[in-house]
Regions:
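Phosphate-ester processing/binding pockets and catalytic centers
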Residues: 1-256
Length: 256
């Protein structure tokens, strides 16, 4: 069984949206690595507590943690908060059997009725399904694996209905070599409805939130991140990027 934790950065709006991009990221691991990697994250958080004073129960929500930490976390200087983010990325990059699937929607030029949320999630679910089918995830593998979704809370109802629909009707355009038209490639490897998680209670959701944030900052860095070269932090995750997710991008980013 492979588990995929999911979070996003940016917003889904098209009209009058303050953001150009919407990023959706999935962090995938095999069930046999779950406890090992949870222990790795706990060790990281204990080290951060000793070094910077960030308590284990404090949520590390990357965007807010860096720019709007609130009264409790504001006691940690901003440059230290950035260092924590960098060290978090470096810790994830050591987890060789993690795999990161990244979807980027460039909303510029899209029609007002373009379904950013639905199409981004459809692309992520399809890549998860495909990679399961081809046994392309690193780490332990059984002959016939399945997968489950563990997203941060989002439009829970819409996502649940989308996944259920894709199990019965999932039109995918034919590759150019096979001519025009579609094939109905229904989802068969992903079981159950999405299991939604509260990021404040899940280190894995906080980890995938960090990845989505760093990819967004790689695309359009804030003034502070640009000043500190933080736009390059996403590249520190290169060892665990799922590069088979897209042959059109050297880092496997699926661009819509």
């Amino acid at each position: 069984m492979y588990l995929m934790y999911v979070d996003e950065s940016g917003d889904c709006g098209i009209v009058n949206s303050p953001t150009r991009y919407f990023v959706l990221t999935g962090l995938v691991m095999h069930e046999l690595r779950w406890q090992v990697y949870l222990n790795t994250l706990l060790d990281f958080r204990r080290a951060v507590k000793a070094k910077y004073g960030l308590r284990l129960r404090d949520e590390l929500h990357a965007a807010a943690f860096l720019s709007h930490p609130g009264e409790l976390l504001n006691r940690i200087p901003r440059h230290d908060r950035l260092a924590i983010i960098r060290e978090f990325a470096d810790t994830l990059a050591t987890m060789a059997d993690l795999s990161l699937i990244n979807i980027v929607v460039d909303k510029q030029g899209k029609a007002a009725d373009y379904d950013v949320f639905g199409l981004a999630w459809r692309a992520l679910i399809q890549r998860f399904e495909n990679t399961l089918s081809w046994c392309n995830f690193p780490g332990p593998a059984n002959p016939d694996e399945r997968g489950m979704l563990f997203p941060d809370h989002t439009d829970d109802k819409k996502l649940t209905l989308l996944l259920r629909q894709m199990r019965h009707y999932n039109p995918v355009p034919n590759q150019a070599a096979y001519g025009t038209g579609y094939r109905n490639l229904v989802i068969g490897k992903i079981i159950e409805d999405p299991n939604f998680r509260d990021s404040g209670h899940s280190y894995f959701v906080q980890a995938v939130d960090l990845v989505a944030f760093l990819l967004y900052q790689h695309l359009v860095p804030s003034a502070y991140m640009r000043k500190k070269s933080g736009q390059n932090y996403f590249l520190r995750l290169d060892p665990i990027l799922c590069k088979v997710a897209s042959s059109q991008d050297p880092r496997g980013i699926v661009r819509l």
